[in-house]
Every structure is written in C-alpha cells, then in structure tokens.
Design a protein with these regions (language model features):
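Conserved donor-binding loops in enzymes that form glycosidic bonds
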Residues: 10, 87, 137
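Active-site phosphate-binding strand-loop segment of PLP-dependent enzymes
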Residues: 112-194
Length: 195
C-alpha cells in the first residue's frame, strides 16, 4: 500500500501575492501599516459597517470584543454575569468569556442548523444574563432575527463569532454585523485565508 501524504495547508500564491508580500517586507512595517488600514476600510465598506479592526486572529478578536464590553462605561458587564453560548463551538469562543470572570451558560443547538437554539436561549435567561454570544457555524447563520428580538426584549447584548461564516448572509445582512459586534477570521482552516 502506497503512503500518500496530504499537506494540512498549502499556498496558492501567484506573482501578485508574492509582490505584495515583498512590498510589506521591504517597508519594514509588518503591522498597522497603510496596507492594513486600507484593508480595514475596504472590509468595513464591504460589510456595510462603521468600523473594522484587524488583529492577529479570530481568537484575539473574540477576546477584544469581551474586553471592550467589560471595560466600557456604556455596558454594565462585570465578573459573575452570565453569557449564553451555544453548546457547539470552539474554545476560542468560550475562553475569553471565562478569562474575564463571566459565567458561561451553555444552551443546546437546533439540530437542523447546528447553531444556538433561540427557544433554549429563552429558557436560560435570568437576572444575571447580560450577553448572548451567537456563533454562525460553518457558513450557516444563526437565527439572528429571533436572537435580536430576545435581546431587545430582555435588554441583553448580542455579539457574533462569525469566524466560520465570512460572507454568509442572514436575510439582507452579512452575518457578523447583526449584533453589537462580530468577529471574523482568515485562519488557514477557514474558507478564506490571508497572510
């Protein structure tokens, strides 16, 4: 039997990408340079958002979303408050919540979508619930209309982990733009990657 090896990841770079990489290397500005600023502006425009802030990973983006809510004077988020999350996701959704001393409340998913089930969310809400962290899994949008309605009725914040669903739409809006904030990722295991 022949041993066949498959690369976990491989590049598909052409001349244009190689020149772009060389331009960045020659500039000696590997972060926060003009190319990043341009990418942020074009990304925000494409998704019809006011802002886009690029960081090193979707994991860091999730952490920054939680941190910005935790340290903001506009939101009353403190240690011990509860965050409703889907039972199916990645550690990178859960760890930032835990890192800030917030309590994870896992709710079951809808078997048809693999996303958080709004009916289960309603059952989990109590006085300590401050946030719903929806995850749009594998290009499949959560029921964002129901989640937004639940959040509005209960004065709860909705944020989205959209790392697996870049470019997906829910009705006429891109996923990741339906809550207060959304995270995106270009990690190599996702359907669109960057370097």
């Amino acid at each position: 039997m022949k041993n066949t090896k498959y690369n976990l990841a491989s590049d598909s770079w052409g001349e244009e990408e190689i020149f772009a990489i060389n331009d960045v290397i020659k500039s000696n500005q590997f972060t926060m340079g003009p190319k990043v600023k341009k990418f942020e502006e074009e990304f925000a425009d494409y998704f019809k958002s006011d802002y886009a802030i690029m960081v090193n990973s979707g994991s860091s983006a999730n952490l920054l979303m939680i941190a910005s809510l935790f340290y903001s004077n506009d939101y009353d988020l403190k240690k011990g408050d509860e965050v409703i999350v889907p039972a199916v996701s990645w550690s990178t959704t859960y760890y930032p919540v835990n890192q800030y001393g917030l309590k994870l409340v896992f709710v079951d998913i809808d078997r048809n979508t693999l996303n958080i089930d709004p009916k289960e969310v309603i059952k989990a809400i109590n006085q300590k619930t401050k946030l719903i962290f929806a995850v749009n899994l594998l290009g499949n949008p959560s029921d964002l209309e129901d989640l937004k309605s639940i959040c509005k009725k209960n004065e709860i914040i909705l944020i989205e982990d959209n790392c697996e669903s870049l470019g997906a739409k829910y009705h006429d809006r891109y996923t990741g733009t339906c809550g207060l904030m959304g995270s995106f990722s270009f990690f190599f295991s996702h359907h669109m990657q960057t370097m």
